[in-house]
C-alpha cells in the first residue's frame, strides 16, 4: 500500500541509525533489490522493515537469496533471533490480491510462519484505516508455537522503537485480543 511506503529521505535516515541493517542485491553492479532490517536494542528479535526486488529480476531467485543474506547478516552477531515481517494480508479484498497471495506464499516457502490470531495493525499516520496486515516470524528450527508474552514484548518494542508510538498504545491490546497462549504459527 502506498501509505506504508517511506520517502527516500526517510529510508536514508533509517539506515543511518545503528540498529538498522541495509543489504543490497546487485546484478552487474546495478542494485536490483534491497532489504532493511531493524534490530531491537535488546537483540532479542528483529523486524524486516522492507524487502524489495526490481520487477525485472523477480522469479529468478534474487528475493530468496536476498532473504538468506538478510538472515545471515542478522544472525552473524546473534544466535538465531526471531525475524518478524509485516506482510499485507491476503484475506482482505484488494486490487492487488494476487500479489499479496504470492508474497505470503514466498515467505512461507522460505520458512516464515504467520502468527495465528494476530491481525497486525500498522501504525500509519493519517485518519484512514491502515491496510489489513499479518505478522510473520522466521527462526530456524522454531517451535510451532510462541508465547503471548513474547509477542507482546515484540509489539511494544516495534511500536516504540520503529514507529515512535507509546509502548502502551491501545492497538497492541487490540492485536493481542485474538491470540491464544501459546500462539500457533500457521
Which residues fall in each region the model found?
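A conserved beta-strand-loop-helix scaffold within acyl/acetyltransferase catalytic domains
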Residues: 1-57
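Short amphipathic alpha-helical segments and helix-helix/interface helices
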Residues: 11-12, 71, 104
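Glycine-centered flexibility sites
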Residues: 33, 61-63, 111
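Short, well-structured alpha-helical interface segments that form or flank functional binding sites
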Residues: 43, 61, 65, 98-102
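Long, contiguous hydrophobic alpha-helical segments, chiefly transmembrane helices and signal peptides
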Residues: 48-53, 66, 106-107
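Conserved acetyl-CoA-binding loop-helix of GNAT-fold acetyltransferases
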Residues: 53, 59-76
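Terminal substrate-recognition subdomain of acyl/acetyltransferases
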Residues: 75-186
Amino acid at each position: 500500500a502506498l501509505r506504508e511506503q517511506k520517502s527516500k529521505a526517510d529510508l536514508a535516515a533509517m539506515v543511518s541509525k545503528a540498529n538498522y541493517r541495509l543489504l543490497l542485491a546487485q546484478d552487474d553492479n546495478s542494485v536490483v533489490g534491497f532489504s532493511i532490517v531493524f534490530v531491537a536494542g535488546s537483540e532479542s528479535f528483529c523486524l524486516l522493515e522492507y524487502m524489495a526486488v526490481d520487477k525485472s529480476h523477480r522469479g529468478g531467485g534474487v528475493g530468496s537469496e536476498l532473504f538468506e543474506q538478510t538472515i545471515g547478516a542478522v544472525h552473524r552477531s546473534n544466535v538465531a533471533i526471531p525475524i518478524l515481517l509485516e506482510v499485507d494480508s491476503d484475506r482482505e479484498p484488494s486490487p492487488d490480491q494476487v500479489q499479496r497471495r504470492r508474497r505470503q506464499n514466498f515467505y512461507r516457502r522460505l520458512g516464515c510462519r504467520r502468527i495465528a490470531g494476530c491481525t497486525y495493525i500498522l501504525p500509519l499516520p493519517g485518519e484512514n484505516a491502515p491496510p489489513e496486515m499479518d505478522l510473520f516470524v522466521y527462526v530456524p528450527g522454531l517451535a510451532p508455537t510462541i508465547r503471548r508474552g513474547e509477542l507482546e514484548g515484540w509489539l511494544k518494542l516495534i511500536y516504540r522503537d520503529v514507529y515512535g508510538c507509546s509502548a502502551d498504545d491501545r492497538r497492541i491490546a487490540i492485536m493481542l485480543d485474538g491470540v491464544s497462549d501459546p500462539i500457533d504459527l500457521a
